[in-house]
Amino acid sequence: MFRNKLIFTTAVCATLVTLSAEDKPVSYYNDVVPVLKRSCNGCHHPGKLKGDLDLTTHAAFKKGGKHGSAFKEGDPKSSNIIEEIAGKDPSMPKEGDPLSQAEVAMFERWIAEGAKDDTPADKRNPFKIAEPPIYTSPAVISTLAYSPDGELLAISGYHETLLFKSDGSELVARLLGDSPRIESVAFSKDGKLLAVSGGAPALMGEVQIWDVQKRTLIRAMQLSSDSIYGVSFSPEGDRIACGGADKSVRLLSVTDGKELFKFDNHSDWVFGTTFSVDGKRVLSGSRDRAMKLINASNAQLIDDINKLLENVICIARHPKEDVIAYGGDMGGVRTYKMQENQGRTAANNDVNLVREYERQPAAVHAICYSPDGSLLAVAGAANEIPVYKTADGTRAGTCKGFTGAIFSLTPHPTKPLLAAGGFDGKVHQYILPTGDETNSFVPFPIKNKAVATR
């Protein structure tokens, strides 16, 4: 008797628990998202849009892909996603186990209940920070650039780009953004805009466009699921090119942020981009060893301009000519004509090679021309910066004073100065071509106070 009552009571409790769970609406954030992450996002994220479908956000999920909207609120029977995941032989996911019957039913009920997005406000953008960071030690400087008038110096920080007076005497603005890592910065030719690229490795890649005078963000574009590198402005300032860890080259409209093209001919990370003097061609440099010349109007590959010798880590175009300099992972420094490389394949010729410079003792991470193109500065894992004459390739001077690798160089537009940043977290400024150090400072507000060392 007692045993029968116990069984009856247990059964009733189980039924009540089940009914209670079914009465509770399906949560997009707590129920749907975990299944999407496990079974779907591997093929449907910004860096890999199978079927043009992105399932990483509610808005993108709702938008759907090439077959139309993924779901229709309140009507699971008319929703494409249910057709794809349900049945004895579902077409999705392509790889991995099919969703369980309970998971399919959960999707159906979520859609029937209106397919609402209940993502908490503080989780909608996991990269956003409310306040500028406080540094406890100098951060690695991955990129820096002088403004065209020479008045400002943009320096990479954590989640921000710092704008200093060019001599380092004053921090004038902190441009806070979503990207934890800032990989490249570039001013437009007129100095009115600043483009910033970066992201969160393996999670998000972004390009930001800033109004330099107002110190305000005009637009931020999350383009991929991995970091964006090598941002550059067209001569007219109406387009931006950038590379990415997703092996792509993108061309973006400055006016509206529209992606004008996505070039997928590289087979490894793309670290650098630049435009030809007339703006009609884009050149990209990649870890796949190739520098590719691309038609800027239609994204067609024109040619690989170089012989494939080593990973291309950094590139810089001559300020007045269609000549490109690159630094490689094996210490190579070479300059090439930015033109078709016809006839290279028969005898493995390097027909566009202009000059091969002194080999560096370690990988080259940064390279730049002086404003008149007469000097070429090179930096990397070796903690000094040799400066070469482009006329004959001889060394004109050497910049010293670093205690670690150097990741970025920028020439002052109106003075014979070179700024460099890297692992030691300081900006070093040198006189060209001799390499005499004239100034160094830590640009990061450590405990709310910028620390200068000289």
Language-model features: where?
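Secreted/luminal cysteine- and crosslink-motif detector
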Residues: 14, 41-44, 315
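A subset of signal/propeptide-processing and intrinsically disordered low-complexity segments
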Residues: 17-18, 26, 283, 419
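Secretory pathway export signals and precursors
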Residues: 9, 36-39, 238
